Amino acid sequence: MFFIHGGSYKTNGGRFYPGEWLAAAGQVIVITINYRLGVLGFLSTEDDTAKGNYGLLDQILALKWVKDNIAAFGGNSSDVTIFGNSAGGACVGLHLISPMSRGLFSKAIAQSGSPIGEWAVQRRPRMYVERLAKKLKCPDVNDSATILQCLRKIDPEQIIDKSEDATLGEIFCAPVFSPVADGEFLLKYPTTMLQQEGSLSPVPLYGGRKKAYQDKDPSSIPFTKDLLRKYLLHLVRKDFMSGIAADVLLHAVYTEYVYRHGTTSHHKKRRQQQHKMSNGTMPYYENNSSVLPDIRTLGKIISDIDLKAPSVKLVNLLTLHPSVSVYMYEFDYASSDDVIANKYVGSYHESELYYIFGFPHMNLSNALRLPEDKEVSNIMIQLWTDFAKHGNPTPRGVNEENMVKNFTWRQYTEEEDCFATLGLQPFVARSYESERMTFWNHFVPLFTEYPILISPNHTKNVPFEECNFTYLLTFAGWLLAIILLILVLHLCSCKMFKNFGVMKKIPIPV
């Protein structure tokens, strides 16, 4: 079992994931690796001067070493499972579609990371290289060879420090030095490749994520609606989005997460604003920053756009390939002996790794000391290692005496979108949060993939007729957006009805 660590492609290391308990309990060989990170691992000039993806090439070199040498450790070179979390999970997905990775592994597990997330692949690498070169006072930022020659004369630590400066201005500093479509490791963007027949390694895969997602305390973020707008636009990474498209997208997000499903205080404040606007005592745009998402709502937005929606889109695309067996999960366990889980909102980013690597069995002095923690760890280890051995996390006729509480993990298919909820008592459900996933995977692309074209003229100091036309065009855009939203939600409702409702448990065959 070959583990690829996460860390936004710029931090972390294999040494933080001790594999001895997983290896002993699961009777497998565990390999953890390091690879080049940040600007040293993923700088790309978008040409042959510096193609990028050096961190991924390091991973391939490690996989080749395993293939050539694992037999000396009692392993099978034709039975290698790659698994990774967060950016490491995205790397797993990229290896699935890379021609350079073919034949180096036989199974794959992508945990809380998808190669089709907007953060997973950089579409504007040249911009950040030029920004870095300016920070380092390179003489010519327009010539790739000159930039590279300049960088090679500068101390690596200084380059790393300035690469952090080069990301300033990006909301939450999503990774900017990250994998690129270089024409060799990654022939095209992941979504395009996943839609092409024969474009991926025909191996079993399962992917999933946590029930909740936090890796920083949202209460420490001075969040406003304007900041949320910038964050959304940064994540969708669409420079051509017009002001009206961005406003409609932001309004749709607020409608979905705050106004429709927000807290009682949100609804109360919204009604007060609507009353003021109807009385003419408050202009419409004055409420731009006054209704803010609470911590849970903010975490849900970040989780959905970063990880959950891309994970669902990934498994849906994988079902188009008959040669690939797909399993999907959600980790939903939070120990009462976990200070991070108590501080945030339950299971959090990377929390399942503690159980997969057997931390509750390592006699920690300050966390994960409960009997339930050990039981969940045993469950996760068995599921992960059974998949590594058999290509099925709950194989029938194997280890029957150790079956996870008569739990059978069913495949995720185009006809039956099953997923497993993992915790003390795993169970199978269907239609994973389908309304919100449909919102991000089908409704939002209407604005990010297809620009709304409007006149660049402003309404200030223009004739009355032109002003009316501008307002009419604006109204038409909003009306179209609302109609599309209604259609998407209707389709979602039909799907939910077809699948017998969200989170409806499926009888488990014994």
Map each language-model feature to its residues.
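Extracellular/luminal ectodomains of metazoan preproproteins built from arrays
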Residues: 163, 426-465
